[in-house]
């Protein structure tokens, strides 16, 4: 419990959350009751402890879809009541994984798989990279120990040469930024093992063929300084076309903001530079934990201000929960939404609003991301002013206009073969379920009418 509290303190959580981390096992492992805990530490702490206890008692039987789906329902409901419940649980899971060497091999794999499928993606969606990154690496360590230790050995083998190269870049960049009058902190880091492994899988390459094993990070005071620093960097090194990403203008769904650019160094070796403000760095490290403010709301707490808007994905999952009776379907939707390997594409509405969709999405996905009524009445789409087929794959920066008609009979089942987002699939399936129900009601009434007339 003390280690969990220390992790929460490192995230700079409020005193009630840290207390809940310290006490999260008390009700389950001692004779102390929840009522006694409330009298001793207050309603807020006991509410958090109770929420964490209920999550701890969940049994993630990988062979039983209904149990997994029900557990996910309970977890997301707990998050909706108070996001700090899941933050305490993430800290608890991180501590468990850190001490996982004492588990039997079967339990190591079971817990690692559960962590990789559920807890690490949730930490990612909450933007808490400090926890997410370590959970990923520890999961890889227990699931594929031979891969993990091979990576550790090979990365360590080149450590001295790599550190010397990174330091030369850091010194060179810092000198040019100083000369341009931009105050900045510049540092370098090796990418994490799971990140490297994922890149190897995605690109079907060996470690020797992965060139950007490290990144240089520049931190400045203002957004204006971010773009000024980018200008300096692009004058110093040759940028690789197609490898620039502006997450400041178009933040990720988990609040992450930075400029990413991949460059060719003076030795011909490519490397990545990330540029962000100090506030953006804090958000990248701590995510929702860096911003969460609370106001009294009955027995729990709710997010204040704009931070509540950052959890739109959670509200989406709760909507699926209400709309979906099928456990297998719900489980598939949630895991698809939390998919660690999914990349995003950023596009625009006709009014200039940014929409973030999974890579590979089509205009149908875009239509349903606006509203189910738009998707259900869609008859075509224009991308950048030109008509496109419905299976067109949206590219970054596309401006999309959906053409609708009140005469549309609704979506086609063939759309399910085309759409890429979980949200669109769910809304299309929901439309057909509603239609079937209405058709059955009409058939039933007709049958009764015929029977009465006979």
Where are these regions (language model features)?
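Active-site alpha-helical segments that house and flank conserved acidic catalytic motifs
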Residues: 17-25, 88, 122
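Short hydrophobic/aromatic-enriched beta-strand-loop microsegments
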Residues: 17, 48-49
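Internal insertion modules embedded within essential enzymes
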Residues: 34, 43-45, 51-214, 226-231, ...
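Alpha-helical phosphate/pyrophosphate-handling elements in metalloenzyme active cores
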Residues: 1-21, 28-36
């Amino acid at each position: 419990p003390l280690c969990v509290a220390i992790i929460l303190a490192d995230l700079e959580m409020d005193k009630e959350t840290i207390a809940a981390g310290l006490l999260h096992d008390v009700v389950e492992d001692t004779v102390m009751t929840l009522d006694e805990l409330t009298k001793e530490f207050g309603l807020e702490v006991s509410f958090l402890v109770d929420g964490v206890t209920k999550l701890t008692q969940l049994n993630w039987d990988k062979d039983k879809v209904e149990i997994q789906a029900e557990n996910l329902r309970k977890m997301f409901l707990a998050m909706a009541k108070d996001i700090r419940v899941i933050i305490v649980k993430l800290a608890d899971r991180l501590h468990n994984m850190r001490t996982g060497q004492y588990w039997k091999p079967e339990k190591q794999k079971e817990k690692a798989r559960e962590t990789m499928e559920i807890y690490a993606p949730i930490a990612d969606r909450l933007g808490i990279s400090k926890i997410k990154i370590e959970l990923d690496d520890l999961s890889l360590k227990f699931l594929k120990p031979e891969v993990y230790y091979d990576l550790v050995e090979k990365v360590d083998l080149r450590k001295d040469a790599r550190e010397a190269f990174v330091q030369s870049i850091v010194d060179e960049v810092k000198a040019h930024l100083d000369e341009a009058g931009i105050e900045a902190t510049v540092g370098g880091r090796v990418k994490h093992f799971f990140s490297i492994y994922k890149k190897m899988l995605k690109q079907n390459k060996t470690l020797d063929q992965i060139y950007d094993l490290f990144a240089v990070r520049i931190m400045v005071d203002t957004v204006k300084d971010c773009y000024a620093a980018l200008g300096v960097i692009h004058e110093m090194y040759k940028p690789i076309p197609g490898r620039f990403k502006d997450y400041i203008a178009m933040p990720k769904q988990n609040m992450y903001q930075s400029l990413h650019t991949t460059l060719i160094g003076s030795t011909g070796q490519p490397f990545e530079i990330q540029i962000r403000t100090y506030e953006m760095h804090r958000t990248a490290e701590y995510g929702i934990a860096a911003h969460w403010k609370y106001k009294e709301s009955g027995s729990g707490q709710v997010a204040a201000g704009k931070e509540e808007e950052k959890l739109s994905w959670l509200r989406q999952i709760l909507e699926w929960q209400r709309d979906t009776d099928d456990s297998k379907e719900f489980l598939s939707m949630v895991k698809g939404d939390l998919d660690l390997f999914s990349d995003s594409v950023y596009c625009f509405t006709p009014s200039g609003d940014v929409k973030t969709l999974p890579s590979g999405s089509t205009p149908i996905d875009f239509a349903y991301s606006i509203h189910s009524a738009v998707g259900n009445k869609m008859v075509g789409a224009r991308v950048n002013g030109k008509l496109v087929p419905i299976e067109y794959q949206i590219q970054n920066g596309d401006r999309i206009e959906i053409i609708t008609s009140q005469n549309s009979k609704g979506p086609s089942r063939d759309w399910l073969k085309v759409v890429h987002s979980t949200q669109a699939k769910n809304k299309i399936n929901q439309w057909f379920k509603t239609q079937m129900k209405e058709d059955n009601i009409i058939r039933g009434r007709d049958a009764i009418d015929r029977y009465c007339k006979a």
